[in-house]
Amino acid sequence: MSFDAKAFLATLTELPGVYRMLDIGGNVLYVGKAKNLKKRVASYFRENLSSPRIAHMVSQIASIETTATRTEAEALLLENNLIKSLAPRYNILFRDDKSYPYIVLSKGKFPRLGFFRGNPDRKADYFGPYPSSWAVRDSIHLMQKMFRLRTCEDTVFSNRSRPCLLYQIKRCSGPCVGFISADDYAADIQLAAMFLLGKQQEVTRRLTKSMEEASAKLAFEQAAVFRDQIQSLHQVQEKQFVSSSKGEDVDVLVAIKEAGQLCVNLAMVRGGRHLGDRPFFPTNAADSEPSDACAAFIRQHYAAHPAPARILSYPLPSEDEAGETEVALAELAGRPVPVQEGRGATHKAWVEMAIQNARLAILAKNQATAQQEQRLAALQDALQLPEPIARIECFDISHTMGEATVASCVVYEGNRMKKSDYRRFNIRDIQAGDDYAAMRQAVSRRYDSIAGGEGTAPDLILIDGGKGQVSSAFSALADLGLTHLPMIGVAKGEERKPGLETLIFPEGREPLQLPPQHPALHLIQEIRDEAHRFAITGHRAQRGKARKTSKLESLPGIGPARRKALVARFGGLPGVLAASIDQLAEVPGVSREMAEKIHSALH
């Protein structure tokens, strides 16, 4: 039974909202937002649709669900949440869940210059966001050189008796030991903030004036400091290929389609300074146009991140799309956020730079893909596997003398590490330090669902270990009836140096040692090292948690609320152990009698 569009449209409201198109199986094909639900949904049922991709989607529609909202901003936020959670087949999807980094200047008598990632609050001054952590750290390095601000943590700052190395190399003015007054340090902080806001000319003017005043007072050492700051500032300005004297906050967005890839590149300009860019390669975009990708990126990105004063887009979204999006962005930001093409020499230069960097990103991605495919082909050939390798899973075990044993399983798929499929296993009910039993348990728990017909089986299993670990892992597969899954162990050489690994096979096949430069070995090392990293971070967290709470959890009469209060008061088990009975009795919910019992049980 075909979808009756005419009857459905007659029931639609003209309010803003979100629509979801579903196929006959109830799968969501597409999620969209609209200023006018009735008008937007009706546009899909015109005779001449602009895109074959959209026409194919419309032919599969069995039903449409709608949600009316009060404003276009609400519709934008709801659309973004649904796209991220449902991942519809016909939506261009951008994975941009990472928060962007900022430069932060803390409050206080001697503020700290630092790196921040997260949601800014009012406890400090934030500058950014920046497209990458590298861009922030590079800017912090420049700020240290120009303004000599401290970057040490407050705990270090308050306990120093002599200046650190940064003072010796003229990257800090030494406020920790009183080598600069609070007033002079505050002046440097003000100049740094002005620089980050794009007021370089004003910073230069003030430094020049200070240098001249110091020279007039014959304070030549101080004048030399100002001179060096001015020179550093000029060097920074020379490195900035294209900057704006207007101190603008602009995002430059370009989308290009070349060499089988669609890349959306976001360049960030803050305070007139070009801070760098970040390329995105969306999924479900093979048949999409660059203008559609720009429109999708604007909706998804700025529903989750603050919008700048202006967005330059190349190419521009359609006129209707751009207009609706501008209204929604203005509601979210509380001010107009124009989406426009580059106008003027500076804006056009920014767009050209973003296009060039998008092309470089496509080239780099295709080269990386070709390299990974070469590695996979070399691995298939080296192991004499009949089928191409698409998915690899690798196991590793981590513990400290048998304490807090954790197994990791990392996944390589689609020419990259697939972190969404990673798993950790807290190993229990084995003899402490028994790596073989730990490996057997981890493999058994991971593939139990595969034996039951659920999930995705790997094309190759890597075991970080030698004959014993491989034998234990293979035994677990045998119990599950999965011995057809290819498996190898990666045994380190006697000197435990990369390139000397030996590949161990189950069931008696001769071990294999690949040359150090073999591409298959490089791939194995990359995956093995990631499994080790994932295992050891999980182990450390588990060990720290166990050491912090294990004895507290075994105390009679101490439930979760009291345990939480004790940890909050004393910072963990060591603090509780060091506390006296009187100090324990001061904790909310702990009586004198209970404090005596706790103290007695712990000592």
UniProtKB/Swiss-Prot annotation:
Matching InterPro entries: GIY-YIG_endonuc (IPR000305), GIY-YIG_endonuc_sf (IPR035901), GIY-YIG_UvrC_Cho (IPR047296), Hlx-hairpin-Hlx_DNA-bd_motif (IPR003583), RuvA_2-like (IPR010994), UVR_dom (IPR001943), UVR_dom_sf (IPR036876), UvrABC_protein_C (IPR050066)
The Gene Ontology biological process annotation of the record reads: nucleotide-excision repair; SOS response
Localization (cell): Cytoplasm
Pfam annotation, one family: UvrC_RNaseH
| Chief subcellular location | cytoplasm
Q: Which UniProt keywords apply?
A: Cytoplasm, DNA damage, DNA excision, DNA repair, Excision nuclease, SOS response
Superkingdom is Bacteria
Q: Ranges for the GIY-YIG domain?
A: 14-92
Which SMART domains does the UniProt entry name for this protein? GIYc, HhH1
Question: Can you name one GO molecular function term for this protein?
Answer: DNA binding
Which Gene Ontology cellular component terms are annotated? cytoplasm; excinuclease repair complex
Q: Which residues form the UVR domain?
A: 201-236
Q: Which PROSITE patterns match?
A: GIY_YIG, UVR, UVRC
Please give the subunit comment from the record.
Interacts with UvrB in an incision complex.
Q: Which family does it belong to?
A: Belongs to the UvrC family.
General function of this protein? The UvrABC repair system catalyzes the recognition and processing of DNA lesions. UvrC both incises the 5' and 3' sides of the lesion. The N-terminal half is responsible for the 3' incision and the C-terminal half is responsible for the 5' incision.
PANTHER family attached to this UniProt entry = UVRABC SYSTEM PROTEIN C, UVRC/OXIDOREDUCTASE
Protein name, as recorded: UvrABC system protein C
Organism name:
Dechloromonas aromatica (strain RCB)
